[in-house]
Amino acid sequence: MSAKKPLALVILDGYGYREDTASNAIANAKTPVMDALIANNPHTLISASGMDVGLPDGQMGNSEVGHTNIGAGRVVYQDLTRITKSIADGEFEQTPALVEAIDAAVKAEKAVHIMGLMSPGGVHSHEDHIYAAVEMAAARGAEKIYLHCFLDGRDTPPRSAENSLQRFQDLFAKLGKGRVASLVGRYYAMDRDNNWERVQVAYDLLTQAKAEFTAETAVAGLEAAYARDENDEFVKATAIKAEGQEDAIMQDGDAVIFMNYRADRARQITRAFVPGFDGFERAVFPAINFVMLTQYAADIPLATAFPPASLENTYGEWLSKQGQTQLRISETEKYAHVTFFFNGGVENEFEGEERQLVASPKVATYDLQPEMSSPELTEKLVAAIKSGKYDTIICNYPNADMVGHTGVYEAAEKAIEALDESVGKVVEAIKEVGGQLLITADHGNAEMMIDPETGGVHTAHTNLPVPLIYVGDKAVEFKEGGKLSDLAPTMLSLAGLEIPAEMSGDVLVK
């Protein structure tokens, strides 16, 4: 068997591009190798943050998201962005689980109950999603639309619910039907520590309108809670009904849509609506059509509007199906990223996949050893390139990220210089065997060590672009405007392999 000429992807973790050289450890370090590559080789910048990697607009990237996107060859949307995007695209209102539950309630002249954390916090839920659900129920002909508001005050300021409640009172006035039916703090409705007596307060409010307090409007109910010195999180069960209105309780045949997308604080209250529940004695147990926005737990037998997205034909899986060999190699700090996250959350190796782990140094903080284990990692990587065993090699160097996180500028420069030396040896080995190499990053970090706004030490990731450099014999010209999810299709193209249909990323080579 002839020796393989590998295609290697080297991910310099935390190695972003920033024009401003102030407090920029990457620009100011002595990097003769990277300077020569950028002067002489095909290169471009690609996006590694925000919507381009499935995060909210403007949000900095991170290693988990970055490697997931690189390995998937498509943008992998986080729940918040996935649902927000579905609303913008008009797909939300066609979601089968929601359509079925609402239509069944409308047909039987029953109520549609929508509940969730009423907040723009974006951690467990987003009120924009709840707004879309109310509009959808109204558009599909629901006459009784009852909104049950769990109040936040943890991911938002402690007393900030009034704007949200007013927004929904205005929406119901505009629709001419529906109303806010109840208020309760997340302390009760969203417990996650088996404090079932708290959850029971919320359950009894939803199913019996059993409440310590009542109010004619949601805003009036909130003002009364503030007068009792209860912040949003701790607002006691409050039933909302004006004179002459019936209790807005969950009854047989009603639809109930739970609009939280984060599972950990949604599970307990949801389990209270499932047969066989024993957390507390339920005075009533209505036969409702309950829809979870996302899957809160695999063992909860209820409909899910947005089931977990399983990633078929990630880069590693696809290479395996083509009978190709691949190596994943990094030091401890980023080993999970080039294996588990790169494989789309799959723990086990694919056939033909090998893994090598180099131990990260045992130091209190990495500014004390900015080169980390790059010499040992490079030695193993060069040996793998020259071994002729692998079609593809994926390697992550953690230095720019891990030393960037320490905030120690001089150490970050040293980390970048150690990386440069390592990259030089890798480039040499690739040229020697006639292979191909792509150098990139998963997100930025070390290019901004001082926060330009505050003047304080900047230890976080950035939302800046990252480099993409090609080394090899092919006449490559890169397109502009790429992103991390374009790397897998680009690599398959460079290797002369077919690209699976699931990979919606672009090939960045013209």
From Swiss-Prot:
Mn(2+) 1 binds at D401, H405, H461. GO terms for biological process: glucose catabolic process; glycolytic process. Its cofactor is Mn(2+). Binds 2 manganese ions per subunit. It comes from Vibrio parahaemolyticus serotype O3:K6 (strain RIMD 2210633). One of its GO terms (molecular function) is manganese ion binding. Keywords: Glycolysis, Isomerase, Manganese, Metal-binding. The gene is gpmI. Monomer. The lineage of its organism: Bacteria, Pseudomonadati, Pseudomonadota, Gammaproteobacteria, Vibrionales. InterPro entries: Alkaline_phosphatase_core_sf, BPG-indep_PGM_N, Metalloenzyme, PGAM_B_sf, Pgm_bpd_ind. One of its GO terms (cellular component) is cytosol. It catalyses: (2R)-2-phosphoglycerate = (2R)-3-phosphoglycerate. This is 2,3-bisphosphoglycerate-independent phosphoglycerate mutase.
